[in-house]
Amino acid sequence: EEINGNNYIDPTQLPYDHKWEFPRNRLSFGKTLGAGAFGKVVEATAYGLIKSDAAMTVAVKMLKPSAHLTEREALMSELKVLSYLGNHMNIVNLLGACTVGGPTLVITEYCCYGDLLNFLRRKRDSFICSKQEDHAEVALYKNLLQSKESSCNDSTNEYMDMKPGVSYVVPTKADKRRSARIGSYIERDVTPAIMEDGELALDLEDLLSFSYQVAKGMAFLASKNCIHRDLAARNILLTHGRITKICDFGLARDIKNDSNYVVKGNARLPVKWMAPESIFNCVYTFESDVWSYGIFLWELFSLGSSPYPGMPVDSKFYKMIKEGFRMLSPEHAPAEMYDIMKTCWDADPLKRPTFKQIVQLIEKQKNKNE
């Protein structure tokens, strides 16, 4: 992972492989999932994307008429990066694109539970503080839910439509271990239940799983010499089986009205997630992504609180960061997870762990928690 800065990929230099082309007349558009000043992401049905006669729910990123050349280039760059990266369970994978005969459309996996930040906030009231003595109760709770299962859905390659009143049980530990070995979550393991997923509780095991999955996704990006630059809970999507997927909705994010993006020079930047070297020297590296991952962990274990609560981004904030101010442990973080956060926030970028090392550290914590 320690790669010379000159080797980071330059999206503008990547080729676009036309094998991804998909006929735009086979897309049927639905509701808007996210929108910004220049772009939006829309839910759509793609006909014949995987199998010749099958319909599949997808997410389609596109530009608005207000977009400029810069935004058009940015969308094309994102398409090239996704094409270059290839598939990984913990990134939002490319499924196709429309680049001829009309505006550019980027077709990706649809993640039915939306972004992780809002998911965490919705689950706050039902969070189960799974201290050791609570584990039996949590296991019983999950087993009771799973005993209410009805018939299995046999679709292994396509998304299942999420209709009101039908939902899917969180996988058991055995399911999760099995899916990790396989390398992707097999949907026949996810069974419809009487209780909707929205009513299923969140526990420490889930938070550790999200931490682990995002670290795996980031290790994959690093192995491909790719820097994310905007890692945060709002940029992680969640799908069936509580699988997390890293995305970048840059064009579809309303950064003008999102207080997380602070005007700095000519740009709006997510300052509270940025490493000091990124804030003060505009340097972005794997190590600065690791800093952002530490902030993401803080969001995760605070169940979606905003970092540096009550602190506006002003000259005092910049001074405190320069002087080494760091956040205290969030409410639900085990001591070992807070230790990881603190190492991610080392002032010396080279003393921060790599994502590969973070994966190993969280693996130990997950095993201990089981």
UniProtKB/Swiss-Prot annotation:
The keyword Protease does not apply. Its EC number is 2.7.10.1. The modification Phosphotyrosine is found at residue 261. It catalyses: L-tyrosyl-[protein] + ATP = O-phospho-L-tyrosyl-[protein] + ADP + H(+). One of its GO terms (molecular function) is transmembrane receptor protein tyrosine kinase activity. Residues 27-370 form the Protein kinase domain. It is an enzyme of class 2 (transferase). The active site is at 230 (proton acceptor). Keywords: ATP-binding, Kinase, Nucleotide-binding, Oncogene, Phosphoprotein, Transferase, Tyrosine-protein kinase. SMART domains: TyrKc. InterPro entries: Kinase-like_dom_sf, Prot_kinase_dom, Protein_kinase_ATP_BS, RTK, Ser-Thr/Tyr_kinase_cat_dom, Tyr_kinase_AS, Tyr_kinase_cat_dom, Tyr_kinase_rcpt_3_CS. One of its GO terms (biological process) is positive regulation of cell migration. ATP binds at residues 33-41, 61. Pfam families: PK_Tyr_Ser-Thr. GO terms for cellular component: plasma membrane; receptor complex. Belongs to the protein kinase superfamily. Tyr protein kinase family. CSF-1/PDGF receptor subfamily. Lacks the transmembrane and extracellular domains. PANTHER family: MAST_STEM CELL GROWTH FACTOR RECEPTOR KIT, TYROSINE-PROTEIN KINASE RECEPTOR. This is Tyrosine-protein kinase transforming protein kit. The lineage of its organism: Viruses, Riboviria, Pararnavirae, Artverviricota, Revtraviricetes. The gene is V-KIT.
